[in-house]
């Protein structure tokens, strides 16, 4: 009977009146528009987990949560974060996730001191293996990027874990058409709003591989229109001197993944058989000095520039979408001024009070060993040749969430057991949001970014602004 109930879609959630009776809240790991992720300790077992708290709200679409849960419940792979349990209260949903505490991919590269093609090859091999598993199970991730590739533990030989299934989708007849993904990693067919398939993930892996070998993205331009055209044309280069020490095998591997025609693009299965992955062609020459320098220049980016590019991409996607509708609507979109960054976006290195307060800590419980890398990168993004880097390549813009405690001292709690401030979600000023990426971040963040952009949205005959996030198409 119990097993049958677990399989029943109406009973996959455990009911709770106070989640704090089950878990001790220890640290804020990440925040989003509709959710907060905490480091928690299970009271009965003492095990550590990442708990994603999702506030129930009319502005939040249950289908988005159901999609993420449906995806996570179907998958079990050593390189994919695991959904351990699900709870529900009158005000929240709670996803109990496997704790990923080893840090982000780029941070680990910067900490290494020595870094080779072979190191990059081993990372991509794990990613390909996990994505191949997803594809075999009819799941397309749709938002693969370095920020979603985390190390399981701080140990040197830790596995890479794929996180963030907020945009994942189970294929229907192998073809999808919703425009989503993160610009800079998104495939040409998605940016052009053409029907696409699981091949979009292979393109993203190609972009990630390119960055891992040189430290900057394959597509960058000084204007958003040129950037979009470059991606849709599939035009990129292996520029000197940044690629002089990289093997021809690595370049060949990338070319097969960054193939404009999705029908000709390498699948994960083919990529796993390439000699750069499965053979001995990945060089052991140290490329750390060049790659680490470019990563610091291009990925510790100005939040103002992140917000600008986010707005440009959302505006571009909206125009493409609305062109399919009536002439009057199309004219309204054409006349709409370009979106500008919200004035409250702070600059790199500034104090972000909205993400620093944490739930009540249990001092008797040791935190996972998390490495620290002091960073102070405030320079404007650059790319080879001295040109400015306008491509948004550092992932989805995170939304500052009212779920994060703001007050000093002990937290007040609501009826759900979470902090009372989370009850503000869905109030006046909060708008609907298509999909909320799960943020699994280690407790000590390397850069204190708070990138946000306000996007004009047409609704009910009037236009209002709401927080937008690259990586999520606001038009579905």
From Swiss-Prot:
Prenylated on Cys-473. Activated by Ca(2+)/calmodulin. Binding of calmodulin is thought to result in a conformational change and leads to activation through phosphorylation by CAMKK1. The autoinhibitory domain overlaps with the calmodulin binding region and interacts in the inactive folded state with the catalytic domain as a pseudosubstrate. This is Calcium/calmodulin-dependent protein kinase type 1G. The keyword Heme does not apply. Calcium/calmodulin-dependent protein kinase belonging to a proposed calcium-triggered signaling cascade. In vitro phosphorylates transcription factor CREB1. Pfam families: Pkinase. Its EC number is 2.7.11.17. It is found in: Cytoplasm; Golgi apparatus membrane; Cell membrane.
């Amino acid at each position: 009977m119990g097993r049958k109930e677990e399989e029943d879609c109406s009973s996959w959630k455990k009911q709770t009146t106070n989640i704090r009776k089950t878990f001790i809240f220890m640290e804020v790991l990440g925040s989003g528009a509709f959710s907060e992720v905490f480091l928690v300790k299970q009271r009965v077992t003492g095990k550590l987990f990442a708990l994603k708290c999702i506030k129930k709200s009319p502005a939040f679409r249950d289908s988005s949560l159901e999609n993420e849960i449906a995806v996570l419940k179907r998958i079990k792979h050593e390189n994919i974060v695991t959904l351990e349990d699900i709870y529900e209260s009158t005000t929240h949903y709670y996803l109990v996730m496997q704790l990923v505490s080893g840090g982000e991919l780029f941070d680990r590269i910067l900490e290494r001191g020595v870094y080779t093609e072979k190191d990059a090859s081993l990372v991509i091999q794990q990613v390909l293996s996990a994505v191949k598993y997803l594809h075999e199970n009819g799941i397309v991730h749709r938002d693969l990027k370095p920020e979603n590739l985390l190390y399981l533990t701080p140990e040197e030989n830790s596995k890479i874990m794929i996180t963030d299934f907020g945009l994942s989708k189970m294929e229907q007849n192998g073809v999808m058409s919703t425009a989503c993904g993160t610009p800079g990693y998104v495939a040409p067919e998605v940016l052009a709003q053409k029907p696409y398939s699981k091949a979009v993930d292979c393109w993203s892996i190609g972009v990630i591989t390119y960055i891992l070998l040189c430290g900057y993205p394959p597509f960058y331009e000084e204007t958003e229109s040129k950037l979009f055209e470059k991606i849709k044309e599939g035009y990129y280069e292996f520029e000197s001197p940044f690629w002089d020490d990289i093997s021809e095998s690595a370049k060949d591997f990338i070319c097969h993944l960054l193939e404009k025609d999705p029908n000709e693009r390498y699948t994960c299965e083919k990529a796993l058989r390439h000699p750069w992955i499965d053979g001995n062609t990945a060089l052991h020459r140290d490329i750390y000095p060049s790659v680490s320098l470019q990563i610091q220049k291009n990925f510790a980016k100005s939040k103002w520039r992140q917000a600008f590019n986010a707005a440009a991409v959302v505006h571009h996607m909206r125009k493409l979408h609305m062109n399919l509708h009536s002439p009057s609507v199309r004219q309204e979109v054409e006349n709409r001024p370009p979106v500008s960054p919200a004035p409250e976006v702070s600059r790199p290195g500034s104090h972000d009070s909205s993400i620093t307060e944490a739930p009540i800590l249990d001092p008797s419980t040791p935190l996972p060993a998390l490495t620290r890398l002091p960073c102070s990168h405030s320079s404007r993004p650059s790319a080879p040749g001295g040109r400015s880097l306008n491509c948004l390549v550092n992932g989805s813009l995170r939304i500052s969430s009212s779920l994060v405690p703001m007050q000093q001292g002990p937290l007040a709690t609501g009826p759900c057991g979470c902090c009372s401030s989370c009850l503000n979600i869905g109030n006046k000023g909060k708008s609907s949001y298509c999909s909320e990426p799960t943020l699994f971040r280690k407790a000590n963040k390397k850069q204190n970014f708070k990138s946000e952009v306000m996007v004009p949205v047409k609704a009910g005959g009037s236009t209002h602004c709401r927080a937008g996030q690259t990586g999520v198409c606001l038009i579905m």
